[in-house]
Regions:
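Short sequence motifs at beta-strands and strand-loop junctions characteristic
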Residues: 1, 48-54, 108-110, 151-156, ...
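Outer-membrane beta-barrel and related beta-rich outer-membrane complex signature
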Residues: 29-33, 37, 80-98, 181-209, ...
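Solvent-exposed loop/turn elements at secondary-structure boundaries
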Residues: 1, 20-51
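Extracytoplasmic gating/loop element in the C-terminal half of outer-membrane beta-barrel translocons
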Residues: 179-272
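Conserved small-residue
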Residues: 46, 63-153, 272, 279
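Flexible, solvent-exposed coil segments and beta strand-coil junctions
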Residues: 33-43, 136-145, 217-231, 287-291
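Short loop/turn motifs that connect adjacent beta-strands in outer-membrane beta-barrel proteins
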Residues: 14, 65-72, 85-90, 253-267
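Membrane-embedded beta-strands that build the outer-membrane beta-barrel scaffold
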Residues: 3-9, 15-23, 56-64, 72-80, ...
């Protein structure tokens, strides 16, 4: 079930705008859910779930300058999407996905993290501290204290923009993409900033700040307080990336035609993913991987 309302226009043969609002209800979505082991199977995949997506798309384009020898244009698009789980399976309102840090709950967006909240390292003894479900500090880690933390795996905002420039035979184009509001668990830090693995894995320079004596203010706890998969590993993975950069030169037709063999020729350079701006410390904010 989909409702779309949009408008598309071009003004002065130079400005173009497309705007669309949508409301999509998707039913009978494929979903894997657990079965009793007495059935002989651990899980089944069936058409049982429902989800609603609401948002808008906007696309803009501007021909800034256009003459016989010179042209310059810019374009961009922006999407906002808010999803909501409206139905699970067997009448359940919530279901935790094992070992993922994610929980599905009717009325919540798909992809909101469900973790125990890390509260820092106690400078008195170097032990990790967490918040329990009631917001009280504790040094005892329990997955029963996991809550929705208001951070999503999937970015609600995404888009891109680009520019094209041409002067005589020279052409330059650049395309960028971005995502805003997405978070990722930096699994690498569990190994590279963890005293437990200091003897077997490469460690980051952050390990030089590990707690050693009372009064030390740090986020690397003593080896006596094991690290856990909690919110301190969640990082803002919003990013802007230059996806493509193309620089080219089209040889003058008069020069090419003198060869008597070819009618046109173009020399160009293409670069991909040349620049990424992000606060995420992992390998790639677009790839959820432990590599």
């Amino acid at each position: 079930k989909t409702l779309n309302v949009g408008i598309s226009t071009r003004v002065f043969d130079r400005f173009s705008v497309e705007l669309e609002f949508y409301n999509r209800q998707t039913d009978d979505m494929l979903m894997g859910y657990p079965l009793s082991y007495t059935t002989g199977h651990g899980s089944s995949v069936e058409n049982v779930a429902s989800m609603r997506n609401r948002g808008f798309d906007i696309t803009l384009g501007v021909d800034i300058l256009k003459t016989r020898d010179f042209s310059w244009s810019v374009s961009g698009n922006l999407n906002y999407n808010k999803n909501e789980i409206t139905k699970l399976f067997n009448g359940l309102d919530e279901y935790t996905l094992p070992d993922t840090g994610l929980k599905m709950k009717v009325g919540k967006p798909w992809g909101e993290y469900y973790y125990v909240r890390w509260a820092g390292v106690d400078p008195r003894d170097g032990y990790n501290t967490w918040y329990d479900k009631n917001g009280n500090l504790t040094k005892s880690y329990s997955e029963e204290d996991a809550v929705f933390v208001g951070k999503q795996r999937y970015a609600p905002w995404s888009g891109g923009f680009g520019t094209q420039f041409g002067w005589k035979g020279i052409s330059v184009s650049a395309d960028f993409s971005f995502m805003l509001g997405q978070y990722m668990l930096n699994n690498e830090r569990f190994f590279t900033e963890n005293p437990t693995f200091a003897g077997s894995d490469n460690q980051t320079v952050e390990m030089l700040t590990m707690w050693q004596k009372p009064g030390d203010v740090t986020r690397i706890a003593t080896p006596d307080s094991p690290m856990q998969f909690d919110t301190h590993l969640l990082e803002n993975a919003s990013f802007m990336r230059m996806k493509n950069l193309t620089v080219g030169y089209t040889l003058p037709p008069k020069v090419i035609q003198k060869t008597g063999v070819i009618s046109n020729a173009r020399i160009y350079f293409v670069g991909r993913n040349l620049l990424t701006v992000t606060k995420y410390k992992g390998y790639d904010p677009e790839v959820d991987s432990n590599i």
